[in-house]
Amino acid sequence: ALKAGSALVDMEFVQFHPTGMVWPPSVRGILVTESVRGDGGVLTNSEGKRFMFNYIPEVFKDKYADNEAEADRWYKDQENNRRPPELLPRDEVARAINSEVKAGRGSPRGGVYLDVSKRLPADEIKRRLPSMWHQFKELADVDITEQPMEVGPTCHYVMGGVKVDPDTAAAYQVPGLFAAGEVAGGMHGSNRLGGNSLSDLLVFGRRAGAGAAEYVKSLASNRPTASDKEIARAHSHLNEPFTRDGNENPYALHDELQNVTQDLVGIIRNEKELIDALVKLESIRKRAAQVKATGGRAFNPGFHLALDLENMLLVSESIA
């Protein structure tokens, strides 16, 4: 949309889920349900300390326990005890984990530990958290009934996107472009509330469909067409990864892009790190022009990633 001339809004606002898998690399970012913490899972740093007690905001201190004894009692007596700080809102937990990792108290793979094995017996964990037990066993070879999980904040939702008319979902400055859902911006302000994405899709998805239909009707016989030259240029661009002389690996470059944005354009940002990020993104952009793809176009993830990198870099720069 940006390449076509559309305006974007709120691109700096990115929501992070506090607990995503951090290992192995192939599954990094897959969500770890909040039910783990709801069923007694505790967050600890590399020193074995439950650090969330150090990150309770003043506004929440009357509702969240400031010591382990009270926090543990809450699971059996919620009326007479304050909640464990692991159950603070997503943003607070994500910032706390990020702070621990940046302070050098993270796990070896850049996260923290989430442990439910000391709270519940093995059969109870499998009954209450069957998907999490299976997820970690199959993807990370970790048995959560006996071992802690390594988790860290993961990019969850981008509040920014295409600037659209709220009634028709039509994009400004690009006639014929309609956007709804996460690709559109301005709906959720700086932070989305849980569950609102589905409502957004239902309401504005319908408006986008109706708006597009009305737009097409208004064109009558004056519908725009793409010239043969434009089609040939798009086709040539599509095939570029196969014809390049470079030898950059799309997977390695994608991994580097993820690390740069996670480390420098993540939950807590400052001017120095953002400037550093933009410099590194420009370097990755130059190397992305040398990404080489092999094989055919169908069912070829490397080829698809080579094409996606161009847009990923554009989005990353917009956020930074």
What are the roles of these predicted feature ranges?
Residues 10-17, 149-150, 222-230:
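Beta-strand segments within the central parallel beta-sheet cores of soluble alpha/beta enzyme folds
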Residues 15-17, 153-157, 188:
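Histidine-centered active-site/metal-ligand motif
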Residues 62-68, 126-148, 241-254, 275:
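Short, charge-rich amphipathic segments
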